[in-house]
Curated annotation (Swiss-Prot):
It is an enzyme of class 3 (hydrolase). Residues 72-257 form the RNase H type-2 domain. It comes from Bacillus cereus (strain ZK / E33L). It catalyses: Endonucleolytic cleavage to 5'-phosphomonoester. The lineage of its organism: Bacteria, Bacillati, Bacillota, Bacilli, Bacillales. One of its GO terms (molecular function) is manganese ion binding. Its EC number is 3.1.26.4. Gene3D superfamilies: Ribonuclease H-like superfamily/Ribonuclease H. GO terms for cellular component: cytoplasm; ribonuclease H2 complex. A divalent metal cation binds at residues 78-79, 170. Endonuclease that specifically degrades the RNA of RNA-DNA hybrids. The gene is rnhB. This is Ribonuclease HII.
Length: 257
């Protein structure tokens, strides 16, 4: 191989998958600083990819254990929006295929918005089935947020296109005959729950952005309904909306004044 330019070396390293590659052996002997920097970057990327693979395998242990028992339709379930002062609570149930793999998959709260959007599209494309459950602020006020979350999860399961054989749920037990395991911080421990958290989060964020367009004075597209200073000040100035949860403090106190 003739001596390549730095740019050519960069393109080659994108193709090279192993240190055993003859082209890599030539590049590693190239003493130019630019090439050595690229080699160092290549090693770091490989190390990161390996760590992501190990993390993914660790997060697949619940699903793999159930598959070993002959189960196929394993639904991960998670919720988003228990804490906000406005907007619905949204849940998702996701059944993933055995060969599903997205490196870097994690709890939706730990991902950037851009990554969540990308993963959302990939999960949508690969999942066997996805069900979403949405419970309005009015129902939250009627039955309380805990019961509303439970109801939204049951709705998400009912909205799946196939009946799950097993449920993996983030920190909740559901009144259903379907066998289940409740996992504390499940969105960081199970790929199915993690996928559900991303579907639920992106779905709810999009709804809150639409609400932001409808009521620009409240800034819903920025705080997603949480009780930020900006949000509380907007309520003080412009009043309580039908999208607000009247049973939540401090809105409850504002109404009673």
């Amino acid at each position: 191989m003739q001596k390549v330019t730095i740019q050519e070396a960069e393109h080659l390293l994108q193709e090279i998958m192993s240190e055993e590659d003859d082209r890599f052996q030539i590049l590693i002997k190239d003493e130019r600083k630019g090439v050595q920097k690229l080699i160092s970057k290549w090693y770091k990327q490989k190390e990161l990819a390996q760590k992501e693979k190990e993390k993914f395998l660790e997060m697949s242990k619940y699903e793999n254990a159930l598959r070993e028992k002959g189960l196929t339709y394993i639904a991960g379930i998670d919720e988003v929006g228990r804490g906000p002062l406005a907007g619905p609570v949204v849940t998702a149930a996701v059944i993933l295929p055995e060969d599903f793999y997205i490196p870097g998959l994690n709890d939706s709260k730990k991902l950037s918005e851009a990554k969540r959007e990308r993963f959302y599209d990939e999960i949508k494309a690969q999942a066997i089935a996805i069900g979403v459950g949405i419970v309005s602020p009015q129902v939250i006020d009627e039955i309380n947020i805990y019961q509303a979350t439970k109801q939204a999860m049951l709705d998400a399961v009912a909205n799946l296109s196939c009946t799950p054989e097993y449920l993996l749920i983030d920190a909740m037990k559901l009144p259903t005959p379907i066998p289940q395991t409740s996992i504390i911080k499940g969105d960081a421990k199970s790929i199915s729950i993690s996928a559900a958290s991303i579907i639920a989060k992106v779905t709810r964020d999009r709804m809150m952005k639409e609400l932001g367009e409808k009521y620009p004075a409240y800034g819903f597209e920025q705080h997603m309904g949480y009780g930020t200073k900006q949000h509380l000040e907007a309520i003080e100035v412009h009043g309580v909306l039908e999208e607000h949860r009247k049973s939540f403090a401090p809105i409850k106190d504002m109404i009673q004044k």
